[in-house]
Amino acid sequence: MTVAEAESEYLKALRLGQKECAMLQGKGQNPFPLVLDQILGGGVSEGAQDIGTLEIPIERIVGVKSAGRISAFSAGFFPLLDCESEFAMKWMALCQAHQGDEGIRDPIICYEYLGNFYVQEGNKRLSVLKYYGATRIPSVVYRIVRSEERR
């Protein structure tokens, strides 16, 4: 895949993200990924249990661990940043790797809470794979342990 082809794919994914955001905003819904740290608020959890590396269904990934980059993605993890951004360049490089011999090899890191997953590391890898129609993604998973589960 050439750089020009990767840029074309990024622009298509960007339009999908913009369209999704507009649709969700029109319905009065949050257009960005959910944020686990905000959901947990204060003291709901007593830690995380390492579950290991699993293939998880992409449809169960609903958010991110922390709020740091939520405005870079639509709720469905399509990109929202300008094509000239460093973010876009990295997304396009992953696109080229995915379509080339190299592939996307490294698992993402995510947290599982109440059956849903929240990405800590690997948002762009998830975005590229989802854009290309992947249904599962390798992930290092940590399960959030709620206070009442430890009693």
Question: What does each of the following model-derived ranges do?
Answer:
Residues 118, 136-141:
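Short hydrophobic alpha-helical runs that function as membrane-insertion/retention elements
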Residues 149-150:
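Conserved small/polar residues in nucleotide/adenosyl-binding loops
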Residues 145:
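Nucleic-acid processing machinery
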Residues 1-120, 124, 130-131:
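Short, charged/polar connector segments at secondary-structure boundaries
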